[in-house]
Amino acid sequence: MKTDRLPRLLVAAAIAALLTIPAGNVLAQGQSDKKAEKKEMKQLNKEANKLADKSDEAANQLGRDVVFCILAAHTSGVGTAQQLRDKFNSLVDFQFGQFVAAVLLADRIDKPLDDIIAKLVAGMSIGQITKEADVNMGEVRSHFGDFRSELARSETNPPTKNCFATNP
């Protein structure tokens, strides 16, 4: 009778071992996903900082009004160049480059610009706001990179028309 128990005990132990392997894999996968998400957020924040720097550089070279014109032309539903300029001018102690990133993020995640600015003022990063909105960080990062490239092109070949200038 004792010999009959041994195979059953071995089978039960083998089944228990097999059941714990997938649970360990799921746990490891969850940790891997968190690391990947953290890395993606870090990359997005880095791209947002590069965009902010390029926006400041373009504003110094071309003027903020021109950057507002370019920004309005590359976004939809966030505001006209005039509305964006007025919104920025109403802010206190808010960096121009960070404002540009906030406008592009508002365009990409379909959240009100005021909400994004409030979260940035409260200390959240672009990456945290994007994660909270459950939007693909890689797409937002790509959008930021595309606009940064557009600003660089505009510095090399400045626009011939200022959207704030009135036509005679």
Predicted features and spans:
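General marker for long, soluble alpha-helical cores
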Residues: L27-P168
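Bacterial N-terminal signal peptides
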Residues: A12-P22
